[in-house]
Amino acid sequence: MKVRWSRTLPAQPSSVTVIKDAAGRYFASFVLDTDPAADATRMPDTGQAVGIDLGVAHFAVLSDGTKIESPRFLRRAEKKLKKAQRELSRKQKGSKNREKARLKVARAHAKVADARHEFHHQLSTQLIRDNQAIGVEELAVNGLARTRLAKSVHDAGWSAFVHMLEYKAARYGRTLVKIGRFEPTSQTCSACGTKDGPKPLHVRQWTCTACGTLHDRDHNAAINVKTAAGLAASACGAPVRPGLVPAQRAETGRHGSPPETCAA
């Protein structure tokens, strides 16, 4: 079998598993031991901390005001996916042409999933590289998936993104704090701390009734996420889940992660 190497393996693998996906593609998953110290030295301490507000209008808004647009991979591919699905439905069951059409549909969906996966990887790596500590809100994804926002929620893939942040933070000695989903991040003024009450989703800006500060809804929420996670003062690189760290979903095996200590 021909293999396309994306990088050199860091160690001799102890086993390899060959996987065939629904789109007819083959992948080889290697199990090997890595040096935890080498991972830690690749990501030196930054002393920076950030809060992240995940959403639909923007994929993420950071506490420093950075807004990351949602790529909307699924919505951009909808016409092509629907066309491929219609062609599949017209083919006779059990025929070779139907199998070809099925593979075409599967590959179209795989292309969307791959693009989303790559976007998550690039953004999560950037955030882990730039920040010693990260705060993110736990989202009720299952509940949102039953609303009119279901397609946008599925397209964003928040759970997979947060999972990447978790395993990369553990691997590279970063601190990741997840705050409760019921924390009133969108209701609280980040300037004075006054809780201003619930606000419908269409309200993108609001003015605090106590101090008069005009807030961008998502930026304000990101600042509150950072504060609620206890990251506002400083990031010190405290120990992050020392020991074995589960590999991400697309990988097999486990990674070693060293404990980190905060300098006095």
Residue map of PLM features:
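Helix/loop segments that flank and initiate small ligand/metal-binding modules
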Residues: 4, 29, 167
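Short, flexible, glycine/charge-rich loop motifs used to bind or transfer phosphoryl groups or to couple energy/partner
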Residues: 6-7, 39-41, 124-125, 178, ...
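Positively charged, low-complexity nucleic-acid-binding target-recognition regions
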Residues: 152, 156-264
